[in-house]
UniProtKB/Swiss-Prot annotation:
Keywords: Cytoplasm, Glycolysis, NAD, Nucleotide-binding, Oxidoreductase. This is Glyceraldehyde-3-phosphate dehydrogenase. The active site is at residue 162. PROSITE patterns: GAPDH (PS00071). The gene is gap. Its EC number is 1.2.1.12.
């Protein structure tokens, strides 16, 4: 399958790296092009080789021509997207079948421009919504609702957010195992990202968001909890939450405080999640019973790393429905691996 990556930033590069680590590059997937603001293949090779958080890429890297990037012997054309809309990109000429839309800009119906340019499908590496009913965007969380994918109908799909990918599998287990969720509040303690400031700067819409990322804990908004309702409709209206952006470069954690529909216990909840991690959520949910911290989940490929030692039950007498669970995630690497998994899934449905 011929693939293009539009946007060669954090997620775009890590998706390519994940393909290489999974030994899919040049075999199951022919990444024919990457699009960014330049075609400087030498610089792209440098960015892939040296990563301040994820470490050095294991594949060989070179630039045999100014606009040709070579990764592990696989040649990729570098396309300059400066000033171009998705509909103006050379997908027809390059024979592109699937575009991974990783710019963060076209997370709506505008991503249909890739189809106009000749691609057959689009995966958006961000939460996405369409305001045009004739151009729907289907949200898929691997391990949770990929069975809803319809190849004939869903030409553009969203991989949701990294936080939704962490939270939704945990919620899915509680629903599938029968304890249910009556209501819940989620907090994500989230590493800073490229949208934040290195020093205090202008942020007219979000004053706190303009403060220096590396020296502050910054309250922020997130739609991740509400988005769970898109992939698990029975939770719609039951979950909401907020974020705290913290001074770590990657490695985040979700804290879900919730009330179950049926009485249960910490031991039972842990058992449910352990069972799921070994069966229907294998490869998506990891069960951990060790004393880990955020640095320990860097470069962990799972969507959600459940921390069984952190599970709490309200200590009121006879209270058997009020709990807190905690699950970690590498908001970069885990998410990028799910983009690749979604691509694999879609390729099998052609």
């Amino acid at each position: 399958m011929r693939v293009a990556i539009n946007g060669f930033g954090r997620i775009g590069r890590l998706v390519l790296q994940a393909m290489a680590e999974q030994k899919l590059l040049g075999k199951e997937f022919d990444v024919a092009a990457v699009v960014d603001l330049s075609t400087d293949a030498r610089y792209f090779a440098y960015q892939l080789k040296y990563d301040s958080v994820q470490g050095k890429m294991g594949s060989s890297l070179s630039a045999p021509a100014e606009d040709i990037l070579e990764v592990g012997g696989h040649r990729i054309k570098c396309v300059c997207g400066r000033g171009l809309k998705p509909s103006q990109l050379p997908w027809k000429d390059l024979g592109i079948e699937v575009v991974i839309e990783a710019t963060g800009i076209y997370a709506n119906e505008s991503s249909y421009g890739h189809l106009e340019a000749g691609a057959k499908r689009v995966i958006i590496s961000a939460p996405a919504k369409s305001s045009d009913a004739s151009k729907p965007v289907k949200t898929i969380v691997m391990g949770v609702n990929e069975h809803e994918f319809d190849p004939a109908e869903h030409k553009v799909v969203s991989n949701a957010s990294c936080t939704t990918n962490c939270l939704a599998p945990v919620v899915h287990v509680f629903l599938k195992e029968g304890v249910g969720i009556e209501t819940g509040l989620m907090t994500t303690i989230h590493s800073y990202t490229a949208t934040q400031k290195t020093v205090d700067g202008v942020s007219l819409k979000d004053w706190r968001g303009g403060r220096a990322a590396a020296v502050n804990i910054i309250p922020s908004t997130t739609g991740a909890a509400k988005a769970v309702g898109e992939v698990l409709p029975s939770t719609r209206g039951k979950l909401t939450g907020m974020a705290f952006r913290v001074p770590t470069p990657t490695g985040s954690v979700v804290d879900l405080t919730f009330r179950t529909e049926k009485e249960t216990s910490v031991a039972d909840l842990n058992a449910m999640l352990k069972k799921a991690s070994e069966s229907y959520l294998r490869g998506v949910l990891q069960y951990c019973d060790e004393d880990i911290v955020s640095a320990d989940v860097i470069h962990n490929q799972y969507s959600s790393i459940y921390d069984s030692r952190a599970t709490l039950q309200n200590n009121l007498p006879n209270e058997k429905r009020f709990f807190k669970v905690v699950s970690w995630y590498d908001n970069e690497w885990g998410y990028s691996n799910r983009v690749v998994d979604l691509l694999k899934f879609i390729s099998q449905k052609r």
